[in-house]
Every structure is written in structure tokens, then in C-alpha cells.
């Protein structure tokens, strides 16, 4: 091979290598394109790691039950009986989670308490709670939370009066279930009370506290609505 042929061969090889490098550079993309592709890949990975909606619902329900269990241990001295935060927790959890999830949270609160989680009032729990005259009120928490969840439904203005009306109704519902249950348990124990006696024992002393808790829930929710708009 002559010297000129060797020079031509070497020049051709250099041109081929240069073209190959340019092709690889185009395939790899610019640094900006590479960074964008990496971000898209990371976003797709985060999307795959997002929490399943069913799992999220279960977490919300259990957290709602835990909030009520925690507030059930809070007691404020008030005449004629102390006021606990239990019903207030029911109202707020129902409003926060909505009708169905709020009611589901109260079902979880009741069932887990029955199987032994000590989050009923005074850190009590267990199957024996079913035999207590006050257990009917816990049953009533289920429809109470459902009604509370209705407070924020609809597109109309959520005025203080409207919210207070919903929460007052939700406060009444535990008594609708609790008073007959109380009468039935006491009757099974041989302690028969008249209608007036049941009202005096299970309703009248709790009216002031019920009004206060409905008002507190109304104020808290109204502040939340205003803050969310702002």
C-alpha cells in the first residue's frame, strides 16, 4: 500500500470515529434533556409508590377512631356532670372524613374497643363494655358521625347557623340510641326506671355539655372553612 493510500485510510477512520461520537451524543441528548428524562423517570417512580386509595381510606378511618379514643379521655368539670371530649371528637371526625368514612371510623372505634383497645372513657375497653348502660351512646356515634359529615356537603354557604344545626342534630342522635339501651340494660339488671327517671339520668344532665360541644364544633369548622378560602 502506498503512502497516499495509508493517509487516505487513516483520514477515513478518523471521520468514521467522529461521526460515531456525534451519533452517540445525539442519542444521549443534551444535558437538559437528560435531566428532564431523569425527572420524568423519578416522577413515574413516585407515582408507582403512591398510597393505594383503599389503604388511605383505612388509615383515615383508623386515625378518626383514634382521635375519638383520645378525646374520650379528656374531661372538663361542668355542672351537673363533667363534659368529655368524646362527642366533640365524633362531630369533628365526621365533618373531616365525610358521612361514610366518618361513620366507618365510629364502627372501627366501637369494634376495636369491644375487642380490647382501651379507648373508651376512662381507658376502658373489652366485651364487658357491651353490658354497660352507656354502651348505647357509642352505637349512636355511628349515625352521629354520618350526620356531621353532611355539614360540609352541598355548594351553598356554610353559615354558622347551618353548621350549628347539623351538629346539634348529630349531638342528639347518640341519645336516641343510648337512652333505650340504658333502659334495657337496667331493666335486665332488675332496675326499672320510669321515662322521667331515664331522662333525668341519661339526658338532662348532658344537655349543657351537648350544646357547648355543638357550638365548639361549629366554631372550629367555620374557622377551618375561612382559612381554606384564604
What role is predicted for each listed range?
Residues 30-49, 56, 70, 127-176:
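Short helix-perturbing small/polar motifs within transmembrane alpha-helices
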Residues 72-147:
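Alpha-helical membrane segments and adjacent membrane-interface helices in multi-pass membrane proteins
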Residues 24-28:
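Compositionally biased, intrinsically disordered low-complexity segments enriched in Pro/Arg/Gln/His
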Residues 53-61, 86-90, 102, 133, ...:
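Residue-level signature of transmembrane alpha-helical entry/exit and packing/kink sites
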Residues 62, 66, 70, 92, ...:
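Generic alpha-helical transmembrane segments of integral inner-membrane proteins
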Residues 155-230:
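Membrane-embedded alpha-helical hairpins and interfacial helices in multi-pass inner-membrane proteins
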Residues 74-81, 100, 115-119, 123, ...:
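Membrane-interface elements of multi-pass transporters and channels
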Residues 2-11, 29-105:
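Hydrophobic transmembrane alpha-helices
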Amino acid at each position: 500500500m502506498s503512502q497516499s493510500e495509508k493517509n487516505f485510510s487513516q483520514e477515513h477512520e478518523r471521520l468514521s470515529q467522529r461521526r460515531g461520537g456525534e451519533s452517540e451524543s445525539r442519542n444521549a441528548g443534551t444535558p437538559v434533556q437528560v435531566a428532564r428524562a431523569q425527572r420524568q423517570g423519578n416522577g413515574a417512580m413516585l407515582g408507582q409508590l403512591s398510597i393505594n386509595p383503599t389503604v388511605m381510606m383505612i388509615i383515615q378511618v383508623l386515625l378518626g377512631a383514634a382521635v375519638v379514643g383520645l378525646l374520650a379521655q379528656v374531661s372538663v368539670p361542668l355542672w351537673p356532670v363533667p363534659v368529655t371530649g368524646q362527642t366533640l371528637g365524633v362531630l369533628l371526625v365526621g365533618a373531616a372524613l365525610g358521612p361514610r368514612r366518618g361513620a366507618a371510623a365510629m364502627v372501627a372505634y366501637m369494634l376495636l374497643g369491644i375487642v380490647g383497645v382501651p379507648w373508651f372513657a376512662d381507658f376502658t375497653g373489652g366485651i364487658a363494655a357491651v353490658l354497660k348502660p352507656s354502651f348505647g351512646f357509642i352505637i349512636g356515634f355511628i349515625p352521629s358521625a354520618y350526620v356531621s359529615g353532611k355539614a360540609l356537603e352541598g355548594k351553598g354557604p356554610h353559615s354558622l347557623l347551618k353548621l350549628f344545626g347539623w351538629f346539634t342534630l348529630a349531638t342528639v342522635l347518640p341519645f336516641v340510641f343510648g337512652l333505650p339501651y340504658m333502659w334495657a340494660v337496667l331493666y335486665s339488671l332488675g332496675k326499672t326506671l320510669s321515662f322521667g327517671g331515664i331522662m333525668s339520668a341519661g339526658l338532662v344532665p348532658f344537655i349543657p355539655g351537648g350544646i357547648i360541644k355543638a357550638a365548639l364544633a361549629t366554631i372550629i369548622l367555620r374557622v377551618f372553612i375561612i382559612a381554606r378560602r384564604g
